[in-house]
């Protein structure tokens, strides 16, 4: 009950932290989509790149999040931004790459060869086939990678509070330092709820964007 009272009494503060957390995750995952999807397309077209690119992305994901945030501090200190949003978003961006690149590669690489041949047969260029045939067919799997990245990094971004990124992780950090169980429980609940709601919303968006013929 104390936790519920705390959340009700601090609803505005919690809402502000939630929107900040959401914005940070959206920024990091958005950058990963902009870079990761084209990178997935590239390694499908140039297959010799697949092993080193996917291997590097996998290696990044094996680094503990607190260690990766720690690595960002001296790197970004060189440009005067050792703590704060920039190193946090960069670290979460790196974590987001693997599921997006891997799912894009898997989805496009597993398409029936006949689809590409049919596109060539009617005179479509590579980019036309990609835009009108391959990406729509691969969209459900690609979107699955995006959903994985978002849900995973809602939790990772909470840890970024230790380097001054803000967001819901502040509740956990302040709860630990102040031995305030209400803040700890409130932070954990808000992070879990945010992950569940975003996963559901992205699933609905995935259904809407997926062509009717392959739902």
Model-based region annotation:
Residues 39-72, 92, 102-106:
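Cytoplasmic-entry segments and transmembrane alpha-helices of multi-pass inner-membrane transporters
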């Amino acid at each position: 009950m104390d936790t519920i009272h705390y959340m009700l009494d601090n609803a505005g503060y919690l809402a502000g932290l939630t929107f900040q957390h959401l914005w940070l995750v959206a920024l990091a995952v958005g950058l990963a989509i902009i870079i990761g999807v084209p990178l997935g397309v590239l390694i499908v077209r140039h297959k010799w790149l697949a092993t080193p690119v996917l291997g590097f992305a996998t290696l990044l994901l094996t680094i503990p999040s607190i260690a990766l945030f720690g690595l960002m501090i001296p790197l970004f200190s060189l440009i005067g931004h050792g703590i704060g949003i920039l190193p946090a978003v960069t670290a979460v961006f790196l974590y987001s790459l693997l599921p997006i690149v891997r799912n894009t590669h898997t989805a496009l690489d597993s398409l029936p060869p006949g689809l590409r041949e049919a596109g060539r047969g009617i005179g479509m260029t590579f980019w036309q086939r990609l835009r009108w045939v391959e990406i729509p067919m691969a969209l459900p799997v690609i979107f699955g990678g995006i959903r994985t990245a978002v849900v995973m990094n809602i939790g990772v971004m909470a840890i970024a509070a230790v380097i001054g990124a803000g967001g819901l992780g502040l509740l956990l950090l302040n709860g630990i330092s102040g031995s305030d169980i209400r803040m700890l429980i409130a932070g954990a609940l808000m992070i879990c709820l945010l992950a569940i709601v975003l996963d559901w919303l992205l699933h609905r968006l995935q259904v809407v964007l997926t062509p009717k013929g392959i739902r």
